[in-house]
Amino acid sequence: MNLSLSGRKIAMTRVSAETQYITPIGSPTLDELLKDCDSFRKGDSGDGVKSDDPAHHIIDVEALYVKPVPYVLNFNNLQYDVTLRRRFGFSRQNGVKTLLDDVSGEASDGDILAVLGASGAGKSTLIDALAGRVAEGSLRGSVTLNGEKVLQSRLLKVISAYVMQDDLLFPMLTVKETLMFASEFRLPRSLSKSKKMERVEALIDQLGLRNAANTVIGDEGHRGVSGGERRRVSIGIDIIHDPIVLFLDEPTSGLDSTNAFMVVQVLKRIAQSGSIVIMSIHQPSARIVELLDRLIILSRGKSVFNGSPASLPGFFSDFGRPIPEKENISEFALDLVRELEGSNEGTKALVDFNEKWQQNKISLIQSAPQTNKLDQDRSLSLKEAINASVSRGKLVSGSSRSNPTSMETVSSYANPSLFETFILAKRYMKNWIRMPELVGTRIATVMVTGCLLATVYWKLDHTPRGAQERLTLFAFVVPTMFYCCLDNVPVFIQERYIFLRETTHNAYRTSSYVISHSLVSLPQLLAPSLVFSAITFWTVGLSGGLEGFVFYCLLIYASFWSGSSVVTFISGVVPNIMLCYMVSITYLAYCLLLSGFYVNRDRIPFYWTWFHYISILKYPYEAVLINEFDDPSRCFVRGVQVFDSTLLGGVSDSGKVKLLETLSKSLRTKITESTCLRTGSDLLAQQGITQLSKWDCLWITFASGLFFRILFYFALLFGSRNKRT
């Protein structure tokens, strides 16, 4: 694009939605540029005159150069203390650690406020405090936007975004797909899909991701975008709705100098479009410092400098430690702070000097004459400023340019719950389909397990031994279905952090996520269930025919569903892979012990009976037993077979016949070699299974999966607030 200023005209050549445009302070928003450029591409110059050359147009700057709506974020006297918990009973009393100590500052639209400091200085803590990620009551002080308190405000979540330090993205989605799904979540449903796509395309160019637009994000096992591109995608997700305030926790961490500079360049363009950008950064290069507008340097929670980078040399010169020429001013400042922290007096002298320096600066500002125009601009209320921003194209979630309603009616979420559920399910399925190794691994696991069982339990007969082997088969099959679901642990742990990032600022509802996650998991379990059932049912020789096979398939499917729900719930409560594995395996082991196989229900101590009835393995185990043995025509002990597995088992067949005749005379009941002495119903009674039908057990198994999904919802709702305490 060729830009040349002549009076108030700009010559634009080959304008397109994909053109990168670095806007000056006071420039139009990206949405406005798209609309204006689109009209010029159609040949309308803006004054009703059609141009003959579609590749060259004259744009009136007055139509584009809109004065930005002023926003000022003030934070005063922020104090944040945490109580150090005792690790052991014999340790000393609880102590208190101060993470933020009387920190104040200001951030304006069009500017980047960078928080600097060594590790542990309080950078991330300050960003979290300003973003409302500190639990209510833990933070003292005030945070206001245009004079109105926004700390712990619902409105702050709607108009702001928070970019975490870790780039947590779905690995098998492309850059464009990732941003498009973000637009579906954060932009109102009233906005057409074509408009959302325009926003995504323009954002791709703004982020410098055009060459990587169709490349998958990637992970350890899949080649994808570079680290710098990945970081820019993370930023793009959170600025898709054009937030008024953007918080970033060390966005340049882990990047080389070139990629770090490119990221801050992107942030500069975002700020110049009318947003407040506040970020923490560890040690910026000289090039990055030139892009920053304001600096706050922290030392152990205290502010040792607050001002523009240009005033930093004068500040330290007045302090008596002038910055040498050609020295990186930020590196010098941070090195000096570290030096003072290691001294006996610490940074107290620098903190006191900063307070006096700030007071002198405030006095100079107050004594300087200000125009009424500036005072009028800065006196806009927050609601007026937000409505004005929406009117001029700021894409605030829950609002639209055509209907900039008052902020009381702005929804916390951009879309209804049903739409969120559909988009979440669509995204999950697209990512899952592109990872066939996960599907293949589970199917391969159940195939190998099924084949192993088929060879070990091939064509069981109807003898006492066959009955016992059926019991051991089912005692192995049912818990195996649950243990196979443990492969969900690492997948969901990763998704959990994506969920936290996206719901921190109301991308979608927790209920929408849980419902979509549950619905998508159902078809994933179908193939493993059918494969395992088909292999084991016919080869082992289970009873029931086609009807029995269908029920067996449903039961295996229900067991997979229940096991998946249990593992998902535990993953939501225990966000650590190794601990989650340990808790899941231990819980399933307890359920197996008290399911009724190892210890008969009548033998379970009365104080553990309650666990027997809530064991998730009890009901599928009983269901499969009923499906196999609840047939009065099937006999498992006939005539002389009654002596098998006893001391008389070694007697000859003729001897057993004589013993049977003697027993028949004693009991005065005719017992022959073909007389059925134990049916399947007798085996069920021996196992203590007489209370429920097999269909009751099946529905209870399905219901247990639903119950754990509900628990999973509450675990995310109350246990994943992602706030400091």
From Swiss-Prot:
Q: Where does ATP bind?
A: G117, A118, S119, G120, A121, G122, K123, S124
Query: Per the record's keyword annotation, is Transport included, yes or no?
Result: yes
Q: What is this protein called?
A: ABC transporter G family member 19
PROSITE patterns in the cross-refs: ABC_TRANSPORTER_1 (PS00211), ABC_TRANSPORTER_2 (PS50893)
| Location of this chain's protein in the cell | Vacuole membrane
The processes (GO biological process) annotated in the record are: vacuolar transport
Membrane topology of the entry: Multi-pass membrane protein
- Mind giving the lineage of the organism this protein is from? Eukaryota, Viridiplantae, Streptophyta, Embryophyta, Tracheophyta
Keywords in alphabetical order, please: ATP-binding, Membrane, Nucleotide-binding, Transmembrane, Transmembrane helix, Transport, Vacuole
**What role is this protein assigned?**
Confers selective resistance to kanamycin.
What residues does the ABC transporter domain cover?
Answer: 73-325
Cellular component GO terms held in the UniProt record: vacuolar lumen; vacuolar membrane
State the organism named in the record: Arabidopsis thaliana (Mouse-ear cress)
- Similarity-based family: Belongs to the ABC transporter superfamily. ABCG family. Eye pigment precursor importer (TC 3.A.1.204) subfamily.
Alphabetically, the GO molecular function entries are: ABC-type transporter activity; ATP binding; ATP hydrolysis activity
List its uses. Answer: WBC19 may be a good alternative as a selective marker of transgenic plants to avoid the use of bacterial antibiotic resistance protein (such as neo/nptII).
Gene this chain is encoded by: ABCG19
Residue ranges constituting the ABC transmembrane type-2 domain according to the UniProt record: 419-629
User: Can you tell me where the transmembrane regions are?
Assistant: 438-458, 473-493, 515-535, 537-557, 577-597, 606-626, 698-718
